[in-house]
Amino acid sequence: MSRSQNEEFQQWWNKQRDRNNHDVLYAGDDEAFLTVEIRTPATVDPDKDRIRTRTVRQLSRLYLLKFKQLASSFLWIGNSFLYLVRTANRRIANDNPPSVSSSARLYRLIKGFLVVVVLLLCFELAAYFKGWHFTPPSVASAEVAVEVVYAWWLEIRASYLAPPLQSLTNVCIVLFLIQSVDRLVLVLGCFWIKLRRIKPVASMEYPTKLVGEGVRLEDYPMVIVQIPMCNEKEVYQQSIGAVCMLDWPRERMLVQVLDDSSELDVQQLIKAEVQKWQQRGVRIVYRHRLIRTGYKAGNLKAAMNCEYVKDYEFVAIFDADFQPPADFLKKTVPHFKGNEELALVQTRWAFVNKDENLLTRLQNINLSFHFEVEQQVNGVFINFFGFNGTAGVWRIKALEDCGGWLERTTVEDMDIAVRAHLCGWKFIYLNDVKCLCELPESYEAYKKQQYRWHSGPMQLFRLCFFDILRSKVSAAKKANMIFLFFLLRKLILPFYSFTLFCVILPLTMFFPEANLPSWVVCYIPGIMSILNIIPAPRSFPFIVPYLLFENTMSVTKFGAMISGLFKFDSSYEWVVTKKLGRSSEADLVAYAESGSLVESTTIQRSSSDSGLTELSKLGAAKKAGKTKRNRLYRTEIALAFILLAASVRSLLSAQGIHFYFLLFQGITFVIVGLDLIGEQVS
């Protein structure tokens, strides 16, 4: 049966419609007619293909570049890991056992703690794989010997061990909160000072020119400038040069170079430097003690016993690595005018090597907070703070009134500040006057410095506690000095930092009945770290390393605090902080090229004109010196294994925040223990 013509037309029409989707069929009002509009396919723009092709080519190149970067990153990580492994092996092989001291005692204690933690971890791992973490066995239902032992352990742990641990945890949390509130109050005080633009204002100002404009030579007080030093051949030139270029009448200033060096070549270099400045007309004297008793305090005390000191009114003190600006005395001495109760004007430190390595960056965070917040707030609101030992000007009458320099502790600067405050003297801190200095670049030097800074205050607190109670100052000042200055900021801070994060936290992983909240482990410390970094905003990328490193340093600070409190022999050791003279050699060459000294009122790196011959001698002395090497710190390594073992236990308990904190804190202890954080000596 043949199809009708309409059916054939319909099939043809459907084929045409499928070929060209742009064909449109219009039905008019008149049903007898159909209008068909056939549109030709749109022509392809050749530029679009070219653009599409170019885009694909660019994407392929971009992905290839990303792949190469990713591959190089993995290669760098692999090489870094291999380097760390080789470095660790080398330092373990070359390690020398520590001497018998308080640090060795602490190491033995931590080593025993590590053995206990490892045994507990093995026990918990066995229990975990047995499935006892789902249904802990009881003594009555236990069948196997191991199960019986574990059941007994659970009962002893819950009944006898966890309660005292929880009590200690609660005490440390309270101390932690008190210290956090103190830190917050200091920051708010600093904000208030900035908001109200509060700062000490001198009653007079010295003109740019020394004499003239209504100022006579007699208007400049007599000032002694002291530079105590000991075997610091890397930095003696820059400190002597900077002090000799102070903008002050030469007839009204005397520079004392107080050299306690035991090395003969260093003595000769310093003596030659002094003679050259004498030839330039500077009133400068060289003093060397044959009997070096009392360390820095004994050195300063001997210098103040000179007969000519009675003719002077003020004394400025600079350590060997400090370079004061030329207008230092013009900005500090005027504050004494008309303020007879003022004993000390302290200025801020600025660091020439703060970006040298990770260790110096982290130190810069701490010291920026110390000067910007602690010293400034205490200076504005209570006129008392700890003297920093350098970059300050003392009224000689105040030094004599409080008994002068004493050799009873390793923090003679804090000692004399406390005694002066108890005698009724006031202090001023100038945050806008800065002196360049160096930060220790090696972990060994920094560790020794921190040990001295934290053992000395405990010695001093033990010695002057009853003097504080018997003093005639107000009860509020006594309370501030005992509870805030000594107990909270010098004793409680290192105690709870070490106990809470290095002892209690890993123990709570093995004693789950004792709870340490997550906000104590992570959130509050994070907020406190942010507050600490505010004075150094460029250091915000280092907030996590800073938090972890501060917990690591709590071991050293805790050991130093215990040593000073209980009169261990190590608390009386004085070790001069090693300097590298980062700013001396380059400036010496610059001077040799220019042929003249540059005087400036801005902070700059300056040195004396001792000549390139002396520089070559200095370089030869450096090469002939003792070979330096990085050390292995066993206490930190042992604590690293404790924290890493606790992180494994927290992983079994599915405690996320605790696990990550313990893991990264343990890795930080490994890095510090292998001495990988500071200067690396190949």
UniProtKB/Swiss-Prot annotation:
Its EC number is 2.4.1.-. GO terms for molecular function: glycosyltransferase activity; protein homodimerization activity. The active site is at D260, D413. Keywords: Cell wall biogenesis/degradation, Glycosyltransferase, Golgi apparatus, Membrane, Phosphoprotein, Transferase, Transmembrane, Transmembrane helix. It is a multi-pass membrane protein. GO terms for biological process: cell wall organization; plant organ development; pollen tube development. The modification Phosphoserine is found at S608. It is found in: Golgi apparatus membrane. The chain crosses the membrane at residues 109-129, 173-193, 491-511, 516-536, 632-651, 657-677. Mainly expressed in flowers and seeds, and, to a lower extent, in seedlings, roots, leaves and stems. Homodimer. Probable beta-1,4-glucan synthase rather involved in the synthesis of the xyloglucan backbone than cellulose. Seems to work simultaneously with xyloglucan 6-xylosyltransferase. Xyloglucan is a noncellulosic polysaccharides of plant cell wall and consists of a glucan backbone substituted by xylose, galactose and fucose. Belongs to the glycosyltransferase 2 family. Plant cellulose synthase-like C subfamily. This is Probable xyloglucan glycosyltransferase 6. It comes from Arabidopsis thaliana (Mouse-ear cress).
